[in-house]
Amino acid sequence: MAKIVKVIGREIIDSRGNPTVEAEVHLEGGFVGLAAAPSGASTGSREALELRDGDKARFLGKGVLKAVSAVNNEIAHAIVGKDASNQAEIDQIMIDLDGTDNKSKFGANAILAVSLANAKAAAASKGLPLYAHIAELNGTPGVYSMPLPMMNIINGGEHADNNVDIQEFMIQPVGASTLKEALRIGAEVFHNLAKVLKAKGLNTAVGDEGGFAPNLASNADALACIKEAVEKAGYVLGKDVTLAMDCASSEFYNKDNGLYEMKGEGKSFTSQEFTHYLEGLCKEYPIVSIEDGQDESDWEGFAYQTKVLGDKVQLVGDDLFVTNTKILSRGIENGIANSILIKFNQIGSLTETLAAIKMAKDAGYTAVISHRSGETEDATIADLAVGTAAGQIKTGSMSRSDRVAKYNQLIRIEEALAAAGTPAPFNGRKEVKGQA
């Protein structure tokens, strides 16, 4: 038995200079797990609650001392003495103790930090790397794959202080044969993009996720800059590198008039018009994945978008599904989208996250493991991607150590599995829905 003997919570600082929750779980034998909760900027309304103190005298109201107190008191008292290797039981104890539908009593940031720290401690007690322990929890021991990165190299929307409406313009190095090669391709495109932007007299400051955040005349201009960078790096767009976008459409959807208002380029669209606007971009550029291409509540719009684009483009639900099996099951039943973005702080525990990944895969949906715009050096999502053989990961650009920490962990994992004589496959383009 991997007996829990101590649980510690503390307030630390994330990549945006805001507080977040870090937890330690200590086991008999001296094994310790340490994990921190990430935080989003563009958040779905149905996400589990991130508990903030609201005290304007501390961190502009964004302190997390209430959540930390829950870790150090109620949660600690409930799980000390329990077996850390029983992840589902530990998570359920915390969920039941919280007693709310959206984890608003303790905060999903408190419960998740403990959930992940517990998994890390249990892995250490078994002498396993975290990804191997996660594979066992997932019911797929020894089944791994290296994820195809989805690299956000131009930031807009809520992730940047610029005039670009679409939140993320990403590249996927689909022509790579290994994860490490994919990262090299991504880095080379990233550096060439800096040269392209500088030559145009554009800003090369970076946004929350490490991508560039220039002011551009249109969203199509962002794609054109990336195309030029890919070619300058010596790669073929559509063959070696494909494109992906996160529209984060809820951020520019006007609920009063039902229009998608893209103020950066002075255009407004109805739901169907916006789908055809995206369809036009897909015809001009090899865009193979679109995330949140409609408002989170516009299920009719998503159904239409899936009908128009779903057979040729991966349509990822983020704010739409919020890593929640109840909402995902409704989407599956109604043929809405064909992929889910997995952010474990949207749901608030590792067990519930694994359930969402399983439900998606069982239904033929892809699962893209994702960071948040507010991150720490915690690299758990790298192990989650490998341990569930999810196939794709979205963890920012090739700058900012809070992003690169995840890529470096993936390099270590790929290397370790190869050294053990059990290399994990890197399937590249085949991982993207509709691209096999």
UniProtKB/Swiss-Prot annotation:
Its EC number is 4.2.1.11. Keywords: Cytoplasm, Glycolysis, Lyase, Magnesium, Metal-binding, Secreted. GO terms for molecular function: magnesium ion binding; phosphopyruvate hydratase activity. One of its GO terms (biological process) is glycolytic process. It is found in: Cytoplasm; Secreted; Cell surface. SUPFAM superfamilies: Enolase C-terminal domain-like, Enolase N-terminal domain-like. Coiled coil: none annotated. Pathway: Carbohydrate degradation; glycolysis; pyruvate from D-glyceraldehyde 3-phosphate: step 4/5. Mg(2+) binds at residues 246, 291, 318. Binds a second Mg(2+) ion via substrate during catalysis. CDD domains: enolase (cd03313). NCBIfam families: eno (TIGR01060). Belongs to the enolase family. Component of the RNA degradosome, a multiprotein complex involved in RNA processing and mRNA degradation. Catalyzes the reversible conversion of 2-phosphoglycerate (2-PG) into phosphoenolpyruvate (PEP). It is essential for the degradation of carbohydrates via glycolysis. This is Enolase. The lineage of its organism: Bacteria, Pseudomonadati, Pseudomonadota, Gammaproteobacteria, Pasteurellales. The gene is eno.
